[in-house]
Every structure is written in structure tokens, then in C-alpha cells.
Regions:
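Core AdoMet radical
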Residues: 1-52, 63-79
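Auxiliary Fe-S-binding modules of radical SAM enzymes
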Residues: 32, 50, 56-131
Length: 131
């Protein structure tokens, strides 16, 4: 904690810190550390989501938002919409706001893979209307 200001305490009112995880291994490694840190405003970002992730052990009242997004780029790994909905349900159960911010370039929904251009990934996530 030597890198934070002397008056940090449990964090500043105007600073939100997010922790990104892309798979279960990184969630289980990073999130216990993240949750133990003196940060007033925390969010968990699953991005790029490259596999199903169970956040139920980590989402609680100390987390202000759970956010999910797929991977962009020509070589993007697929993101399954069912994984996104599972994170959403985990957030709802924990009374944590959820945000689906980006589909990624390869979104699987109902067994079909959709190739979504970068310029439409945010708008397509909004159109899902699951926030």
C-alpha cells in the first residue's frame, strides 16, 4: 500500500477501481486480493470474457457493479451469451448492478456464432436490454 496517498484511508469518494478477469482461474486469483484492499468503490469487469465464470463468491454489497464484455479483434475468442446471462443472474442475486458493455467480435447465442464488427459491439450489447 506504499503507492497510495497518505490520506487514502478506505479510498476516495470520487475514485472507483475495477478489477478485470477473463476466466475462472484469474477470477479466483485476483478477486480475493481485490476484495481485501481498502477501496471504497469497487467494480468487477469480466472482459474479455473467454469462458464461463462464477462470480457468486465475490459479488456482494462491496461491489458497485458487475460488467461483462466479449473480446474484440480479428482473432477474438468467442463469448457465449449464456455466460453473460449467468453473470447477470449472479449480480441480480447479490443485488449488484449489472452492465453488458460489449458483445465482442464473436458472440455465440443459441448455438449460432455471430461475427459482429467492432463499430456495432457496444450498440448490440445495449440492444440486448439486459442491464
Amino acid at each position: 500500500m506504499e503507492c497510495v496517498p497518505d490520506d487514502w484511508g478506505d479510498g476516495y469518494d470520487n475514485v472507483l477501481v475495477g478489477c478485470t478477469v477473463e476466466n475462472q482461474q484469474m477470477a479466483d486469483y485476483r478477486l480475493p486480493i481485490f476484495k481485501s484492499l481498502p477501496i471504497k468503490h469497487k467494480s468487477i469487469i469480466v472482459a474479455p470474457m473467454i469462458e464461463a465464470v462464477d462470480l457468486s463468491a465475490y459479488v456482494d454489497r462491496s461491489i458497485e457493479e458487475g460488467s461483462v464484455g466479449g473480446e474484440s479483434g480479428q482473432d477474438a475468442r468467442p463469448c457465449d451469451y449464456a455466460w453473460i446471462l449467468a453473470i447477470r443472474e449472479q449480480c441480480i442475486k447479490a443485488d449488484v448492478p449489472f452492465h453488458f458493455h460489449q458483445t465482442g467480435a464473436r458472440l455465440i447465442k443459441d448455438g449460432k456464432t455471430y461475427h459482429i464488427p467492432r463499430c456495432h459491439q457496444h450498440s448490440q450489447a445495449r440492444k440486448a436490454n439486459i442491464n
